[in-house]
Amino acid sequence: MIGIDIVKIDRISRLKARHGELFLKRFLSDDEIALAKNDATLAGFWAAKEAASKALGVGISKECGFLDIMISKSTKGAPKIKFSPRIYTNFNIKEASLSITHDGGFAVAAVMIV
């Protein structure tokens, strides 16, 4: 299963400016907030979680919320993705991979789940 998402970085910047920490905590864990050094990274994390939920075929919903999807980085800075235990079980996930890119004011993410 493959999911992709694109988001304008400015959109995430505006939401963060308007709602501050409440906005961040709606879709990120404390560890993810600590990793996100700028709005481009925040937008990439948003796109990654949306792409993952699309790969599962449910979108962000009761079946898979933002906080069921966890983004981290490898020692070399590459993005990594994990899911909550219930998501692994409910969707029979064996492996997942994530790619995030930023260009022209956009963040794009692709997630592959097997």
From Swiss-Prot:
NCBIfam families (UniProt xref): acpS, pantethn_trn
Main location: cytoplasm
GO molecular function, one term: holo-[acyl-carrier-protein] synthase activity
GO CC term (a single one): cytoplasm
EC numbers on record: 2.7.8.7
Swiss-Prot/TrEMBL keywords: Cytoplasm, Fatty acid biosynthesis, Fatty acid metabolism, Lipid biosynthesis, Lipid metabolism, Magnesium, Metal-binding, Transferase
GO terms of biological process kind: fatty acid biosynthetic process
Family classification: Belongs to the P-Pant transferase superfamily. AcpS family.
Top-rank taxon: Bacteria
Record organism: Campylobacter concisus (strain 13826)
EC main group: transferase
Subcellular location per the Swiss-Prot or TrEMBL entry: Cytoplasm
Function according to Swiss-Prot or TrEMBL: Transfers the 4'-phosphopantetheine moiety from coenzyme A to a Ser of acyl-carrier-protein.
Amino-acid positions noted as binding Mg(2+) in the UniProt annotation, renumbered to this chain: D5, E50
Classification lineage: Bacteria, Pseudomonadati, Campylobacterota, Epsilonproteobacteria, Campylobacterales
Cofactor: Mg(2+)
Protein name per UniProt: Holo-[acyl-carrier-protein] synthase
Reaction equation(s) it catalyzes: apo-[ACP] + CoA = holo-[ACP] + adenosine 3',5'-bisphosphate + H(+)
